[in-house]
């Protein structure tokens, strides 16, 4: 199976299945000398861990990470970092009926068509548990970026029709509600909306927004290695993501040049800055020094208890009610996944940028 590796100089390879022995990641290209311990990674994994609210799957997993290689005496060694999380609470019997039919909205049918075989227990490689490896690698990437003064603000921007209000935005609220929304009023309304969805045996989607602060200008490459293109690839590779935006995104189609262009101005420090940020921090595929603002549209959880139509492997049309332990919404748990994929992409772009200019090479090797 190809397609499990991302990156060029900072490279990750995820592995494992939802109901296998474990899941994990191998990270290639992490510099030596970074302070790193399991607690650093665990903080990130705990943000996506199941069973933490009534809006997450009741599957109880500690998701405890173990560092198998690449770290010695609390520092990275420059060799591949291997991280593993063992699965502890599989209930594969919940999926025995699924072996005979294709779940609407899942990858069952496409896996079967490609490989002639599929792991029906929780979706195998297409399960949300695959993102554990991404988040573990993301924790390492964010630690590297924090050393360079680059930080993240990532949160749930909307759930169904309920969106965060700019007038009520308070990032400190994110950790105070189970939906990771920076707006207490919107979070309360979204909880009521989700409760209604659950009563109707239904699920909901939403939008995750990620703001990257402290980015220097000039990171990314023109043409086929644009920073926005690579961010889109990384975020769109998350199984539940169906849409991606940078800056004003699809709203630019309704704009004019006058109100879409960001005027350049001199900042208080005398450096070039922008008066607005419709571009979302990227121009010509390269960072412009402003905040990078991206959004990911997350689809509703496809496993719902309501009756759905499908076809079984005998070619018969049937009606199904999917059983098992499923999230009524995965948006809150996807927040850290989106952040992780963005961080991994940014680190790779920063490393690639080191050979862009002779003066940078001379400074490094002199």
PLM regions and their residue ranges:
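Glycine-rich, N-terminal phosphate-binding loop and its surrounding beta-alpha-beta segment
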Residues: 44-104, 108
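Alpha-helical support elements that line or immediately flank enzyme active sites
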Residues: 21-33, 128-150, 225, 229-233, ...
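Internal helix-turn-beta structural module
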Residues: 11, 303-366
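Short acidic, glycine/tyrosine-flanked loop/strand segments centered on an H-E-D-like triad
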Residues: 99-124, 308-326
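Glycine-rich, mobile lid/loop segments that gate access to catalytic sites or pores
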Residues: 113-223
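N-terminal, positively charged regions that mediate nucleic acid binding
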Residues: 1-59
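A short glycine/serine-rich beta->alpha loop
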Residues: 11-14, 119-130, 217-221, 277-282, ...
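Glycine-rich anion/phosphate-binding loop at the beta-strand->alpha-helix junction
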Residues: 15, 21, 201-204, 208-317
